[in-house]
């Protein structure tokens, strides 16, 4: 940590980490991990694995900072910052605060006048949006859909008439039911893209209608991390005509689309 004048506060750095492959880490991330003295990590094992994969020797004191402890550990981290200690905030994958811990600490630091900066990098949201082939000029990120059925139905009903492309996170085991509910609220023919295991060895990008994708997801276990992209009302994929010309089926539930045969899992 650089020398500071007495009374000068530390800096909170939000560090984006790879969403799949360790080698996607930026040189700046490698440098910051190497020199960090305090790391607030969603999963301490994950940050140690990442450091080992990057041949980085961690010298930092690592503080566990996940959803269940975020509220009670924020004051302590804020005190560290106010005492002049820099804090590097990392999550399991992607950017802190985006469906991951970080918001509370950032809000508290901002209110206290702490300097906050970002070490930009991978994001499953923009990665999925970019490869989807759906319009990218306007979009909304919806995170994980609500767990309670009533809340989910209300949320989907509100979004059904939205003209923006929608991006969701979902687990593999809930994907089929989510796609079925979206088909009921948004229309069976609404275009969507399932992005599974983005940037990883078993990455899969599957395009189709909500109904077709729901049928595919319901036909076998879908494993891995899912980012779902759904077209806005009245908006179509810019590559839809190309997909048809290469023989891809309109419904992914029968023959799959351009990125490979139907996949039942793993």
Task: Identify the meaning behind each predicted range.
Residues 1-67:
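Glycine-rich, flexible N-terminal cofactor/catalytic loop recognition
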Residues 2-10, 61, 85-86, 164-165, ...:
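A contiguous loop/helix-start segment that scaffolds small-molecule binding in enzyme catalytic cores
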Residues 33-39, 113-117, 165-166:
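Short active-site oxyanion
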Residues 41-42, 100, 169:
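Short beta-strand scaffold positions
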Residues 45-47, 94-95, 124, 174, ...:
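Alpha-helix capping/helix-boundary segments
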Residues 63-72, 145-149:
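Conserved helicase motor
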Residues 66, 73-123:
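Glycine/small-residue-rich loop that forms an oxyanion/phosphate-binding "nest" at active or ligand-binding sites
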Residues 103-162:
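Class I SAM-dependent methyltransferase SAM-binding "motif I" and its flanking Rossmann-like core
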């Amino acid at each position: 940590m650089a020398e500071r004048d007495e009374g000068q506060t530390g800096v909170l750095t939000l560090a984006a980490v790879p969403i799949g492959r360790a080698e996607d880490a930026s040189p700046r991330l490698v440098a910051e991990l190497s020199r960090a003295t305090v790391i607030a990590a969603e999963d301490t094992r994950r940050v140690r694995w990442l450091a080992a994969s990057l041949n980085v020797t961690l010298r930092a004191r690592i503080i566990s900072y996940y959803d269940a402890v975020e509220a009670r550990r924020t004051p302590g981290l804020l005190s560290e910052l106010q005492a002049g200690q820099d804090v590097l905030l990392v999550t399991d994958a992607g950017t802190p605060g985006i469906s991951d811990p970080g918001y509370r600490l950032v809000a508290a630091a901002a209110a206290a006048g702490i300097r906050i900066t970002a070490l930009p990098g991978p994001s499953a949201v923009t990665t999925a949006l970019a490869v989807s082939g759906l319009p990218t000029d306007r979009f909304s990120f919806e995170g994980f859909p609500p767990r309670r059925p009533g809340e989910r139905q209300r949320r989907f009903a509100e979004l059904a008439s939205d003209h923006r492309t929608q991006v969701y996170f979902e687990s593999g085991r809930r994907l089929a039911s989510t796609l079925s509910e979206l088909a009921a609220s948004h229309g069976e023919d609404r275009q969507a893209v399932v992005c599974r295991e983005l940037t990883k060895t078993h990455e899969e990008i599957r395009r189709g209608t909500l109904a077709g994708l729901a049928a595919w997801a319901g036909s076998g276990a879908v494993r891995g991390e899912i980012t779902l992209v759904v077209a806005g009302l009245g908006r179509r994929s810019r590559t839809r005509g190309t997909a048809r010309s290469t023989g891809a089926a309109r419904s992914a539930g029968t023959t799959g689309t351009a990125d490979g045969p139907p996949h039942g899992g793993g």
